[in-house]
Amino acid sequence: MFTLNPNSPMPLVGQIVDGFRRLIADQSLKPGAKLPSIRGFAASHGVSVFTVVEAYDRLVAQGWLTSRANAGFFVKRRATDAPAAIAVPRPVADLRFNAQWYLKQIFENRNLPLKPGCGWLPHDWLFEDGVRRSLRQMAADGAELGGYGLPHGHMALRILVAESLAEHQIAVGAEQVLLTQGSSQALDLVARRLLKPGDPVLVDDPGYPNLMFMLRFLGARLIGVPRTPAGYDLQALEALLAEHRPKVFFTQPRLQSPTGSVMPLAQAYRLLQLAEANDLTLVENDICADMDPELRPSLASLDQLRRVVYVGSFSKTISPNIRVGYVVARPDLLDELAQLKMVSGLTSSDITERLAFGALTEGRWRKHLKSVRDRLADAHGRVAQRLTGLGFELFGEPKAGMYLWARHPDLPDGAELSQQAVGDGIMLGPGQLFLVEPRPTGWLRFNVAFSDDERLYRFLAAQIRLQEAA
């Protein structure tokens, strides 16, 4: 029928649900077919009766099965008409490697147990204990759960953000902090305020695919600024400024996705000079600042928000489910962003913001961040060694943050390689997704927190051997 993997990150209940959904979707189990009894399935697959009960109940709730008293569980007729939200992921052959695919599949496809191409930390690296303690404290305090939040966000958290930024030499008050539903909403608000359809806009190349997709959706004309292992190609940037006269540059100077590179201090000063000379607004996406053990200066700390709009987030290190980000800007611009936030989606979630505030202030946050930084540094060393041992070229060795950018001379097409990897249950990050002008490339983004896994290297070694034998 199907096998269960007790070592998979997917819980056994989820594996059972997915297994039966697939059998029903491909007609291996036809409408009216009877499923194995609960005790029979539990005995044959080595799981508890309670696990099978929960899985069968989920399949009933989702419309795949029907339960008959004293008779058992049966495939429900018209189960193939189940809502799209619970549809079985498309076959491997149907996957399309572009930004839209990446945005959808990296989150939706639950059948890939290993995701070295993803952009978040593993569950056991996150601050879930802090979130649970915050939830319990909110319940114990009798926190009000109804009503809207404030337009700028929960005041106590805004004060905390301002105090945290002061430690990073960014001098702002709480009135200059706008809380958002993650950094994605912050970037979207800034883009919609600063850009019009047809406007040229500078972005890192390679860079953040979600941002590129969003900017294209707004009708902006994307111009890539080449990233190098040492930051930016400033000569190319100066030429692009002269040719296109853009007014906005969205960039991630620190621990950049996908390259992991960091902008040197000398480049930061030069970039600010160019921004001043060319009337350019710099939108600094600094969502990995908490992962930087050196706490290097940001553009915002050097500029004090004259030409820099600063975007941050707690989602990477608390939990992706805690969608709390923020944008910091000069007062007049921030007020306009707050108005735009209200027009487009009213307030952000006050409950989520209070939950984040509780997690950040319950006393263990700094210890958690140090643990994350240490684990990332260790993973960088091991993953870099494994990749270079297979013959991969590293774009750089940042030794911090989540990412390594690498390619192998015998694997020239990262998209084709990624297509093969899906068949082995592995989600890679093919380089063309991160390019302003997508084209075949051998570069791949590796999230070191997910790449310290023998299954990945067995797959890569096998693909290299196939190419060498061809």
What are these regions (language model features)?
Residues 1-136, 338, 342-348, 378, ...:
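N-terminal basic, amphipathic alpha-helical segments
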Residues 374-384, 394-407:
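Conserved glycine-rich beta-strand-loop-beta hairpin in the small C-terminal domain of fold type I
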Residues 70, 303-336, 351:
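Active-site PLP attachment segment
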Residues 140-278, 290-305, 468-469:
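Conserved core of the PLP fold type I
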Residues 67-68, 172, 428-429:
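Short beta-strand "wing" residues that participate in macromolecule-binding interfaces
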Residues 337-344, 360-384:
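Structural signature of PLP-dependent enzymes
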Residues 397, 423-445:
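Conserved PLP cofactor-binding pocket of PLP-dependent enzymes
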